[in-house]
């Protein structure tokens, strides 16, 4: 069985070099723009070209994938097209994508690019992978929440290559649908600007004696023990997270997993290398849901502290004072220590560790400083004078930086001058009596050619046997022109002589002409793509029901609720009621719908599918949909592309299908894609802005989200409360500013909403002037008091923002 690809992070050029040096088969790197790690070092197009050349110079050649996994605003489409064109020109081995608009542009205008579906697309099942593969993705990065059995089942399905994360940081929310950072501070995790709000320190509401903690702060994923199972399952690519990490970290973690995949990692080596890695960067590790979804939340979340901890090396015995008033930490070290290493001492009661450098080191009881001391030594380390409190006896001590580890992973320097250019061409040189004719043709998929004719009398050669060698020597010097000659043919039927100066001039001129031809060809392609992307979309399909698309001068208001929610008479004037059926059983769904039918008639009700569906939940949901279709339900809403395919399969009589906000369409290209898929109307994202909606409003299929109890987190994992036990059904937390978060269990997931709902209802008149007629209020993510719900509904219908709400990014903009 072939081994899987080991895919390492490359936050910068040096990290990529380190990854290749220590065994990565491929790296993934972001550019200066449009990367889900916008604050990583990232690469310029020029440095990406050098990295590609380096990767292809290695034996065997390695691969470079480019991350383009952010959501695009409409104004960014021209720059995105230029970036796609550059990636296509460089010939990257794959592009990792989240945005459906970007996918549409790449598929239509740059068909040579291999497209990989980012984990931000939240593929949770075989059907999710099938749906992505059916649209043209060749590889899918699965959601991290899957079990080993689910991964193996997805691989066996063979719909696309499967890539999974095996190590690194975890988001509390399912990747791609986290809105916390965006709503809290305008920094979208879907655009690479996450503010890591899930690491915040919070206090449980209603528990005055509970200590503050980090109830949503995840441990780091570490699937080292499961590598044999993943190899046996046939996973195509095993991916390490870490584009924000140092080259040293990348070297060490890549080396560890390379040895594990190859089967050369001994137990002793494993323990030593893990400890070394922990000195570079490490939170506590977790296997997450590898062995099933019933894992203990405390084995997944670390509520006591955040950030780098190190490797455990000892326990505080005491703190001594010297004659100068200095304080010395006494302990027995489990690993060798040397000056300038880093230590962290963890408070016995929890909380953030105290970190400091080893600036003075000595044996216990000695007065002479040492440069280093071996493992097993009883040592004393001087504490920094600015450390506010002395560590208590019994506190754990960690080594958080090691000079020895730094020396263990030297990173080579790439000799860039020795790298061959990326672009290859075939050259034909013809010597004639009347002059020299040189033709160069690009050998990649772009059919660019150039011919140069130099009229000059070529005399007979004195040594015709040396002519071809002279031509080859001249055309060997192409690096500065950005081309390498992959094939050279010399035609010299009359044995003519061409001086070296003429050959060099011909080389320069033909390669300049070929470069110009390539630039013109690519500019024309960009212009065509840009012209297409800026065309306004046609009106939605005429097949859409008359009730949805007849002309209205007044706004049409939609309310979305959950089938488990108690009906509210206040919604009886909704132009449309969307009922989320979730993953409730058949009888619960029937009872819930019957209750809502007492408020709104059937012809004004649309049924909505849940957002995340695992394989184990798929068959019961299909059965339920077929039963509902048989009952005559014709109007539906999907939340992802797999849901659209599910409806096509199970509800053939669907008269129209709309898309909820989670099928992101923040640009007209994405709306174009959804329209092409048969979507009749799409709900705007809770992240969207007024300026962006102004550009997108002409697509004619928009339903503006103007009120929502927004799901800031959607997670498989319950938060960890102060008691350490998962909440029984719901729990609330408050930050130091008094802002509250509410987390409840819904459909087997944990949904976190803020204390204040999102609303931009006061913008309805302006949005109407843009041509938008449909407006939505969404209560489907959290139970809502009927009185509060009715008051908010009435305010929104009057174009007023409900009391206590916030407008998120709508006016402040989105990073």
Residue spans of the language-model regions?
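Active-site pocket-lining/capping segments in soluble small-molecule metabolic enzymes
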Residues: 1-123, 141-146, 150-237, 244-396, ...
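Short, conserved phosphate-binding/catalytic loop or strand-edge motifs used
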Residues: 127
